[in-house]
């Protein structure tokens, strides 16, 4: 409590910045009255944060930047085993892994860098052959407004105008690479405390966002939005993150059963990195992901359909989703 208070005082008093939503316990804004959206079946979306041209053989934590990286190889194994799954990658189009790259080499890990042309071509071909979607994960995955902590929260200190500019820049980078994202997830979950990032996402022309986990993003400090259903929010659809691949398998299975009972959406989320990062695609979690898919196929074939977030949004746009009458299940 004291640590958070000191940080908030530093942000407001020294930096003269708006306190991010993760520090703003006075913010009572809630979207819990937003009607849950459901479909005639439950969709399971496997999704990863942080795909970028940053390889394992750099001095940083790799993000699938080489075709020989562990996560790249394991992803291909997964697609060969289960070609029917959908994967949404929240991609970083111009990753800056340290401050050095702000000053000296901002294009090094850009998807537009000619040095990364083969990597980009590989992933675009992969998306053409399998059900893979690329969505925006900001531009840099790094913020320079607060140099002391939470450097990975790119949108934490950006107001509406700067958030919109950053999102527009992100979309432009993707478009130049031949990718047309319709979705977004904020790096590090955090956002400005007035939650105008939601308005910026809508104004940028994006169709959906993943802005909430159980305790991150819109659900920082208190629950503001559904844990288990997509909801319409200021002109965009919010998809929750509700299963992490580093959870115990029994907990994952129990959560899947609960979500199926509520006719919600199953969002199985990880980081596209081999190790160190929380919830990463390690060997252990890769094997667990295989077991998750097998479990769903064995117990819910015909009930659960694998998809990308874009697929589920398209169902909504086509009018195939409806308002749910289910009561929201509270997190235990």
Show which residues each predicted segment covers.
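Metal-dependent polysaccharide deacetylase catalytic core of the NodB/CE4 family, i.e.
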Residues: 85-194, 218, 268-278
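C-terminal domain-boundary segment and adjacent tail
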Residues: 36, 208-216, 220, 265-332
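Loop/turn elements at helix/coil->beta-strand transitions in domains of secreted/extracellular proteins
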Residues: 41-42, 82-88, 128-133, 179-182, ...
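Active-site-adjacent pocket scaffolds in enzyme catalytic domains
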Residues: 2-35, 110-114, 176-275, 318
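Active-site beta->alpha N-cap acidic-glycine motif
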Residues: 14-125, 180, 185
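Generic enzyme active-site microenvironment
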Residues: 47-48, 135, 306
């Amino acid at each position: 409590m004291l640590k958070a208070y000191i940080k908030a005082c530093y942000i407001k008093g020294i930096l003269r910045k708006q306190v991010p939503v993760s520090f703003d316990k006075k913010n009572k804004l809630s979207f819990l009255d937003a009607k849950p959206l459901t479909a005639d079946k439950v969709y399971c979306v496997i999704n990863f944060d942080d795909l970028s041209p940053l390889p394992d053989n750099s001095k940083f934590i790799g993000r699938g930047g080489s075709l020989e990286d562990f996560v790249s190889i394991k992803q291909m194994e997964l697609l060969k085993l289960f070609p029917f799954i959908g994967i949404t990658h929240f991609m970083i189009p111009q990753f800056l892994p340290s401050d050095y790259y702000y000053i000296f080499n901002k294009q090094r890990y850009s998807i537009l860098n000619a040095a990364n042309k083969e990597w980009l071509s590989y992933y675009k071909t992969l998306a053409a052959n399998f059900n893979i979607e690329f969505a925006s994960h900001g531009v840099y995955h790094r913020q320079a407004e607060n140099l002391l902590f939470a450097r990975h929260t790119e949108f934490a200190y950006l107001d509406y105008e700067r958030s919109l500019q950053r999102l527009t820049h992100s979309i432009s980078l993707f478009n130049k690479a031949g990718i047309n994202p319709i979705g977004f997830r904020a790096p590090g979950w955090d956002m400005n405390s007035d939650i105008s990032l939601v308005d910026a996402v809508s104004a940028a022309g994006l169709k959906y966002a993943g802005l909430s986990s159980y305790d991150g993003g819109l659900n920082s400090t208190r629950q503001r939005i559904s844990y288990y259903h997509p909801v319409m929010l200021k002109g965009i659809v919010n998809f929750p993150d509700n299963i992490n691949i580093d959870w115990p398998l029994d907990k994952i299975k129990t959560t899947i059963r609960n979500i199926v009972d509520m006719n919600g959406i199953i969002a199985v989320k990880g980081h596209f990195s081999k190790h160190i990062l929380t919830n990463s695609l390690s060997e252990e979690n890769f094997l667990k992901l295989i077991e998750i898919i097998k479990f769903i196929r064995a117990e819910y074939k015909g009930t659960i359909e694998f998809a990308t977030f874009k697929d589920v949004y398209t169902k909504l746009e086509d009018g195939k989703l409806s308002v749910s009458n289910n009561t929201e299940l509270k997190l235990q």
